[in-house]
Curated annotation (Swiss-Prot):
Xref: PROSITE patterns: ABC_TM1
Transmembrane regions: 15-35, 77-97, 110-130, 156-176, 205-225, 260-280
Top-level division of the source organism's lineage: Bacteria
Protein name as annotated: Probable starch degradation products transport system permease protein AmyD
A biological process from GO: transmembrane transport
Family under the similarity heading: Belongs to the binding-protein-dependent transport system permease family. MalFG subfamily.
Keyword annotations of the record: Cell membrane, Membrane, Transmembrane, Transmembrane helix, Transport
Entry GO CC: plasma membrane
Keyword flag Transmembrane: yes
Amino acid sequence: MAKKAKFFKNGIWYWLFIAPTLLSLIIVVLIPFIIGIYYSFTDWNGINQPVFIGLKNFMTLRDDAEFWNSIIFTAKFAVACIVIINVVGLSLAMLVTRKIFARNFMRTAFYLPNLIGGLILGFIWNFIFVDVFQTISDATHIGWLGGWLSTTNTGFWGLVIVTSWQMIGYVMVIYIAYIESIPTDLIEASKIDGANSWQQFRNVVFPLIAPAFTVSLFITLSNSFKLFDQNLSLTAGAPGNTTQMITLNIYQTAFSAQEMAVGQAKAVIMFLIIAVISVIQVYLTQKREVEM
């Protein structure tokens, strides 16, 4: 009885400690999520009383070419960001974990862009791409520097550059944590066996930091699909909504066109896409970790 009473008493304290976080999660995330799913099956403009209409909102999305184009654009953007952010982030992590001069300063410098808000970052880079690059182009007659963000292609790579510049430092920190946890004995043993730098990385380092790769891949994937503020402040979908990502398309549908229910239906589709891709990605990468 004494053990049960002690367990019950401790259990109450556990629940008391997690209750604020759990309550916040339910109020801020779970309840709005459920309400949002309900609204996706209604005719609602954000003001009038919602009227249940079943799958009509989802059926209308079949003919919404702009929405599907935004999904394709977002998918291409996500692939580019995943590759660039993880490759560069891992490379920088390998660099700053070596015994080199000013490595702590370099860690700070590489991480700093992550502390800047996405909206502000977009406006800063918009000024750089549009004004600074154009000035340099006029002075040096380098044609490709002019007209940035004026085409779909330059707008796409502008978004990739800005997002990568912001997130590389964050991913670098994740890789650093795993790299520094690798026992130095393993590295020394591989050197004694005659392994070169690439062989050490491929056969010793990478298998041990595979969990970091899983985490970083998931973060970059989800953040790339959910990106909104940089898209709004950098290109705003221009030219002609060809650089419009799925989140910006949802925003414009819900708030600019006052079609809240249709926008919510798009958000549900976006959630399903991210959920399916994330589950597959985590499953495959964890399976790869076991094989390593």
